[in-house]
């Protein structure tokens, strides 16, 4: 069964620990941990200096709470976007997390990740 053919529940079960690792690593400003599940395409664009600048200038991405909830999946081509409701330990309100997953070499990898 291809990755994109899995049910939403199956994909969310795979996505939750990946998202959790992104949160933990981002809060610790840990480049190696943050990029460990990146696809080769994402790694190519994930410059450690640029990520460091983002961590320094954006309070939200280093204060993410482990209180998150996946609420849906969108399929497009070879990728699935998992949407998360995310909160922060310092910023008020709820934020939208977006995690784009796909298969690379038989493993589920990150092809995109953002928070709004």
Model region roles, listed by residue range:
Residues 1-28:
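Short, low-complexity N-terminal intrinsically disordered segments enriched in polar/charged residues
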Residues 21-22, 33-34, 84:
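Residue-level detection of beta-strand scaffold positions
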Residues 27-41:
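Short, well-ordered alpha-helical segments enriched in acidic and aromatic residues
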Residues 40-58:
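A solvent-exposed, acidic/Ser-Thr-rich amphipathic alpha-helical stretch
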Residues 52-103, 112-116:
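Surface-exposed, charged secondary-structure patches
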Residues 106:
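Catalytic subdomain that performs nucleotidyl-dependent activation
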């Amino acid at each position: 069964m291809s990755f994109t053919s899995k049910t939403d529940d199956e994909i969310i079960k795979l996505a939750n620990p990946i998202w959790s690792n992104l949160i933990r690593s981002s809060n610790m400003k840990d480049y190696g941990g943050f990029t460990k599940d990146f696809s080769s395409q994402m790694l190519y664009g994930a410059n450690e200096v640029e990520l460091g600048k983002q961590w320094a200038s954006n309070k939200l991405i280093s204060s993410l709470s482990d209180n998150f909830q996946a609420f849906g999946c969108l399929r497009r081509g070879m990728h699935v976007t998992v949407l998360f409701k995310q909160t922060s330990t310092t910023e008020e309100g709820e934020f939208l997390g977006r995690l784009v997953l796909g298969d690379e070499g038989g493993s589920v990898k990150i092809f995109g990740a953002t928070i709004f």
